[in-house]
């Protein structure tokens, strides 16, 4: 009593404390970063290695395997995958959440160094690593176009100057430049001219390499001067290489230009980038795993004026894609929803109390509690994101509950004629324990969430802490500021002028009288109500099993990604044509704003596209509806497929896949994997629960298999090394020398001129100079025949792997898809040598499914323990928790009604309902117990009186929580797919709970009271008819 009196009788101190909380919250709000979701990115590092001309199998065995063995020893690696394609290997290391990315990077570099001696000597450079997840969608894409600059020159400028500058911006993890390659001097050899001159390809290579040398020459000095020696030992342009003497034939000089075309070109001519319909260089910017996307994008945008100032006038720099506008729009929608919730909650209070002064009290308490929460969020390192703002939106209904309970009880004493300060003190004392019980038991619901591990735990932690802090501040405010304002602002009234007898008050009285009449009937038919209660428990179980489930709601971020997969034997020229055709189809769609894409490099038969949709206000369809519409048009393109998926704010795993979800096949036998993967993929493609089924296993690439006759080679004086060197020189785009320039280093690339390598007959023109100096045609000692070969070789851990990716058709949940896949795998009878498991988001979904029930049970158990401690009873917490089954039924039925799957967001709603609906029972039980102790009433009389006495605050708190959540249900625009499942769950649960618990709670209270008496071997009192 003295504690409450301290604040009631010292209004200045109380007001200043509340002002201090508010000011701290305002400061915290201004300092909080902005993000779409809490920071849940796994630390991911990508290791890259190249060996131009090497086949995928060679890259896998000689490059990937040694690196994997070394990298696999690093502590904290959650998953290691690799993909080896033509001339390149990429290894993705995904670390545990608690692994520091910088420490992991140091370990990765050490592992690369340890494996260096095991790697092929012909690698042009050491393996490198990047602290970025290649499967993440870029946060921004910049494009460079020019009417006068070549693609190679644009690429050089982009990679040498722009990418370096952008990479230095805080938060940027990787700047991937695509669409071309660095400038190079290309030497296109004429096989017939070489044969006529008797010059081998190795001789050409050695001559070029020897003619372009950068070595220190030293200096000459005397007693006065010093001269640095400088020579013309470097060749830098095609014009300087053409007159190079590479051989003498009967005393006549054979120059490079006589046997080859020498041009200023690019390192890899098999690259192409496009933006809309124009050739372009793309700068795809990805953030560091721990970086804030909005801050990073803002940093890039702030740098753009400086970048444009350093760009020549002939180059046009544009932003082709930016993830931040939809994120900002989504957060603005949540903020507006929060404001509407506050207004609706205050309106509910006003309609019940019909007093401006009384309404002003919760109208002050709510903002103080919410704004003060921002200070705690800042101290905890949180951000303003969809989940934390949704937590505050839901908290609106919670924080006003405490104020309502205190205010309503004080108002009841004022209506009875008690003086304001006395009413404030008496009313607060009566409900102080109730308010504390409600708040502590509500916070207890979130304790299991705080202890939950993995990605779901990280994702929900900010939500749980934010809501708990808001409830804690609300508890303090409701026991200090609220009674002080009541005592000094409200006036006592005579019974004949009670406001609740007019308008809404008259309706409330009528409802209360009707409730009293129906409650009398219920208390005289407790068995029927008991059956209804048990029915809700059974219905909960059935609904939870039957409802479709998913991990996270599918978001419409306004950005699509597309993966092109063409015939495995397609040429680069044809692949570039497919890219252009697909881009035209998408560009013509009315909902599309911008399209960029690229192909080439190690992506022999694949490409990537990035599509920016128009803002939600300018299009009628959702991202998924647009994908469904485009899928029909894209399917008509022969020889290739384009798989579209909506970019999500949560992307789990480091695999780059052409669909949102993955199922990975593993085997220690590559032959078994290659045998069963097509069968499994075919079976999964036939499932109606899956769409866009595709695989990263591509074993049907065209290959020309050369078979050496070793006996003939020995007789002719030719070894295998010379033969292999011939093929590498001719067809491997071999980098044979380096040109050093002030800003970068460029390569001299040698190969047979494309004019002479259009078909297989090019092999017939190849020859080797034997030990006797004679030109021996390749056909003399080798035979060749076409065959199939893999375009990529994939590993997970150290096992051969193949990942089948899939999307979900409209109306299908992830749980339905995973069940269909598991059922199909069982029906196929896949041998034990081939193992299947879900990867990425589908894997996390499976783990979350296994822990959902445990989490709900843990929350209920935690609430029971807290309530048991507060009430010093084993029985009363069970009475309070009896309100939960009806809320669960309402929530699950509402989800079914709105055709919304049960997701992580819906799980949050269920957890919130555990905290919300028990408040009704707490108010009933508290007053019933007090009536039994002090009033000498029987349990039947006590619970009946408690139900009638607390009917008004129960209705007020329930309607406040309901109207606080209603804007989430009705919200549209950006991010609504996250908000609506939470609102649907809470509103559905509250409506059903309010209809049932007003009757089931008193019945359960009486049941446990009689059970208590029976176990204590006391005769129960006779039932009193009411």
From Swiss-Prot:
GO MF annotation: an example: xenobiotic transmembrane transporter activity
Protein localization: Cell inner membrane
Transmembrane domains' residue ranges: 15-35, 333-353, 360-380, 387-407, 431-451, 463-483, 528-548, 853-873, 897-917, 953-973, 984-1004
Gene Ontology annotations for the cellular component aspect, listed alphabetically: plasma membrane
Entry similarity comment: Belongs to the resistance-nodulation-cell division (RND) (TC 2.A.6) family. MdtC subfamily.
Quaternary data: Part of a tripartite efflux system composed of MdtA, MdtB and MdtC. MdtC forms a heteromultimer with MdtB.
Protein name in UniProt: Multidrug resistance protein MdtC
Keyword Lyase in annotation: no
InterPro entries from the UniProt entry: AcrB_DN_DC_subdom, Acrflvin-R, Multidrug-R_MdtC
Pfam families assigned to the protein according to its UniProt record, in alphabetical order: ACR_tran
Gene: mdtC
Main location: membrane
Membrane topology: Multi-pass membrane protein
Keywords: Cell inner membrane, Cell membrane, Membrane, Transmembrane, Transmembrane helix, Transport
Entries under HAMAP family matching the protein: MdtC
